[in-house]
């Protein structure tokens, strides 16, 4: 079946914003006016089409990005709704990774908020072309011009108004389209579906002329001919103006700003027009790069004729279909029933059902093309960030980077039935979200959940309870300590047990020394002449490994240690692999004591982005947390402070930073390295755990 929509007519875009700026409502209205939704879902009623997890509908925040296809003016829109909460930035990152453009929604009462800064920076990182929608113009305190100033002051970006509001707060009637120099007014009784062009109100004409001139001056800077014509007194025609604004969006020269009130159904259709006119199609953005089998860089153009390459950017568990993998097709054509290779994991997969998603409704399709965002059912191996491709032309697309989890909690199921359900549920949750990890504490047998923040883990626990009906007790958040030796130690140990009949005998001699940081555990047998027979060496290794998970300082895993078996003795009758395992365990524990084991704590690389006024307070606070300031620089008009801080001193930091900066500073942190804990910290931890 041939392609219905030319790839030039695709717009793959996301809607990004601070929590509560009206992102989901804006998406709802887009679905309503593009004819995909017959009833408008209100977020505050808990009925929004895009927010389909129970947790989202209750909390009124969007947690998982839902992908939706809609149509406007003959163009095909693939929309991704992204969360605005700081603990879910992984979702925003992976959405931006597969999108070509974005609409940044601002609350025109609040202007640019902390999380707007975070998502804007993520947009900068992936060079995503953006337009800005100043939403909630009907709200008390709405100020379109403050939004423009905020974009300059807080994002360090260049905004250009291409619309102006007519009235504000409860008098918000419509907008002035500066490109066409027409007023656009909505009729209240038609739920915003009907609007009409009108002449610009007399009292706003001067302001409109002033802002149109600013817009034209910014646009003609991008084209010498248009600039020359403008200097000769000729204003660019509408088509030329649109072409230049589009060029600005694609190059990041400036960001067009529109206005409206999604909740009051005003301004959504012109926003859709702007998406079509100014945001890029898949062929307008740089082609994706990857690496072939030989490690050479290859480029995949957005073209059906190129070899097939798609990127899995989200995994979801669907109660009806099973595992759904959301993929962006970068090149080639994908057909259901074909075999592909998961080049990231070197596994073969067969494409079963292919679905086009609309929030949580779905449509089966047989074929998908370059530029499409599709959901694939039944993939066994795929994980977020994996590449699927043509087996004849393998490629690994750029890997997504996922931050290390920084916080962990223990979870204990209340019954045997809960234990079984928990295992299945956690495997699914970990597959869906790469920033969520699960492990087992060998000592206590407890299951440990690791995540990006407290809300992140709260939501996971909530999903376990509701979706998977697991009843469990949750522990307090903990830090993952480690242990290592600091000096070389030599030990000689003999295990002897004679109790009539067959006894036990094994003697080992070890040299144990610190390994290079990050090298982990290494074992080497230097036995010559059969002092310890070969068949007993696995027993020796097993004995050492049983101690690695629980060191002698406070019972934490031992890292970066090298063990050499240099000598030993055995008995023809009484020796066995088990005897050597017991001897090695005791010898290694003795070596850890002799080698002066110390406690290591995780050190986090912390980046705080703060308005300059709060720099002194932020640095003082980081110092009080045993932080070491690595440097500062300016980003836009914000100060960026980089520091190394022990994780144990970072609990509750988000709330401190928020109150210290009136919510204007944001921070990110990720694991950097382990370092020896000071004596007082080590003593405190030993008292608690040893």
UniProtKB/Swiss-Prot annotation:
GO biological process: ribosome disassembly
Keywords per UniProt: Cytoplasm, Elongation factor, GTP-binding, Nucleotide-binding, Protein biosynthesis
Domain tr-type G: 8-283
InterPro entries: EFG_II, EFG_III, EFG_III/V, EFG_IV, EFG_V, EFG_V-like, EFTu-like_2, G_TR_CS
Superkingdom field: Bacteria
One GO cellular component term noted in the UniProt record for this chain: cytoplasm
SUPFAM superfamilies xref list: EF-G C-terminal domain-like (SSF54980), P-loop containing nucleoside triphosphate hydrolases (SSF52540), Ribosomal protein S5 domain 2-like (SSF54211), Translation proteins (SSF50447)
S-S bonds: none
Residues given in the record as GTP binding sites: 17-24, 81-85, 135-138
Gene3D superfamilies, per the entry: 3.30.230.10, 3.30.70.240, Elongation Factor G (Translational Gtpase), domain 3, P-loop containing nucleotide triphosphate hydrolases, Translation factors
GO terms assigned for molecular function: GTP binding; GTPase activity; guanosine tetraphosphate binding; translation elongation factor activity
Pfam family name, one: GTP_EFTU_D2
Subcellular location: Cytoplasm
PROSITE patterns reported for this sequence: G_TR_1, G_TR_2
Function: Catalyzes the GTP-dependent ribosomal translocation step during translation elongation. During this step, the ribosome changes from the pre-translocational (PRE) to the post-translocational (POST) state as the newly formed A-site-bound peptidyl-tRNA and P-site-bound deacylated tRNA move to the P and E sites, respectively. Catalyzes the coordinated movement of the two tRNA molecules, the mRNA and conformational changes in the ribosome.
Entry's family note: Belongs to the TRAFAC class translation factor GTPase superfamily. Classic translation factor GTPase family. EF-G/EF-2 subfamily.
PANTHER family registered for this protein in UniProt: RIBOSOME-RELEASING FACTOR 2, MITOCHONDRIAL, TRANSLATION ELONGATION FACTOR G-RELATED
HAMAP family noted in UniProt: EF_G_EF_2_B
Name of the protein this chain belongs to: Elongation factor G
């Amino acid at each position: 079946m041939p392609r219905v929509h030319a790839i030039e007519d695709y717009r793959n875009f996301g809607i990004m914003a601070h929590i509560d700026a009206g992102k989901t409502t804006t998406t709802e209205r887009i679905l309503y006016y593009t004819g995909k939704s017959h009833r408008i879902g209100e977020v505050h009623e808990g009925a929004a089409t895009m927010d389909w997890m129970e947790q989202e509908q209750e909390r009124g925040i969007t947690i998982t990005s839902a992908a939706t296809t809609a149509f406007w003016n003959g163009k095909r829109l693939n929309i991704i709704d992204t969360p605005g909460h700081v603990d879910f930035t992984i979702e925003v990152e992976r959405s931006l990774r597969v999108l070509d453009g974005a609409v940044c929604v601002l609350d025109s009462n609040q202007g640019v908020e902390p999380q707007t800064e975070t998502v804007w920076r993520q947009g900068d990182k992936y060079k995503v072309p953006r337009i800005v929608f100043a939403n909630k113009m009907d709200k008390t305190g709405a100020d379109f011009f403050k939004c423009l100033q905020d974009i300059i002051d807080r994002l360090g970006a260049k905004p250009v108004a291409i619309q102006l509001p007519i009235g504000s707060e409860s008098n918000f009637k419509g907008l002035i389209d500066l490109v066409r120099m027409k007023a656009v007014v909505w009729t209240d009784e038609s739920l915003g579906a009907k609007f009409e062009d009108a002449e610009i109100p007399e009292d706003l004409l001067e302001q409109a002329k002033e802002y149109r001139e600013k817009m034209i001056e910014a646009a003609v800077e991008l084209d010498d001919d248009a600039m020359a014509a403008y200097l000769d007194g000729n204003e660019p025609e509408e088509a030329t103006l649109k072409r230049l604004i589009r060029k600005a969006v694609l190059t990041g020269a400036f960001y067009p700003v529109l206005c409206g009130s999604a909740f009051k159904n005003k301004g959504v259709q012109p926003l859709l027009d702007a998406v079509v006119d100014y945001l890029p199609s898949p062929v307008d953005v740089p082609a994706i790069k990857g690496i072939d089998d030989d490690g050479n860089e290859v480029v995949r153009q957005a073209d059906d004729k190129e070899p097939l390459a798609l990127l899995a950017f989200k995994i979801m568990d669907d109660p009806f279909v099973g595992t759904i993998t959301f993929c962006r097709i970068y090149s080639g054509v994908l057909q259901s029933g074909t075999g592909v290779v998961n080049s990231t994991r070197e596994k073969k997969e067969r494409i079963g059902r292919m679905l086009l998603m609309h929030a949580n409704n779905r449509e089966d399709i047989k074929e998908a093309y370059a530029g499409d965002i599709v959901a694939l059912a039944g993939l066994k191996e795929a994980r977020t960030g994996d590449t699927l491709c043509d087996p004849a032309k393998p490629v690994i697309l750029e890997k997504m980077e996922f931050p290390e989890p920084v916080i962990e909690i223990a979870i204990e199921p209340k019954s045997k039935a809960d234990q079984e359900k928990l295992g299945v549920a956690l495997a699914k949750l970990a597959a869906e979200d790469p920033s969520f990890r699960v492990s087992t504490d060998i000592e206590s047998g407890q299951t440990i959940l690791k995540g990006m923040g407290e809300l992140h883990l709260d939501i996971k626990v909530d999903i376990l309870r509701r979706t998977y009906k697991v009843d469990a007790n949750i522990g307090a958040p903990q830090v993952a300590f480690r242990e290592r030796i600091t000096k070389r130690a030599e030990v000689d140990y003999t295990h002897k047990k004679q109790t009539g009949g067959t006894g036990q005998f094994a003697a080992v001699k070890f040299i144990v020394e610190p390994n290079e940081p990050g090298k982990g555990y290494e074992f080497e047998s230097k036995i010559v002449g059969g002092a310890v027979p070969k068949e007993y060496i696995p027993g020796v290794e097993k004995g050492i490994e049983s101690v690695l998970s629980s060191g002698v300082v406070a019972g934490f895993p031992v890292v970066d240690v090298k063990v050499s078996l240099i000598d030993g003795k055995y008995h023809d009758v009484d020796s066995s692999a088990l005897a050597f395992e017991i001897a090695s365990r005791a010898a290694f524990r003795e070596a850890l004591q002799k080698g002066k084991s110390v406690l290591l704590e995780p050190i986090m690389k912390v980046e705080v982005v703060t308005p300059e006024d709060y720099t002194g307070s932020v640095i003082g606070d980081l110092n009080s947390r045993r932080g070491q300031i690595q440097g500062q620089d300016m980003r836009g008009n914000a100060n960026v402070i980089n520091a190394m801080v022990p994780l144990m001193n970072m609990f509750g930091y988000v709330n401190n930073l928020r109150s210290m900066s009136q919510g204007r500073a944001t921070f990110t942190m990720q694991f950097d390295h382990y370092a020896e804990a000071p004596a007082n910290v080590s003593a405190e931890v030993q008292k608690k755990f040893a």
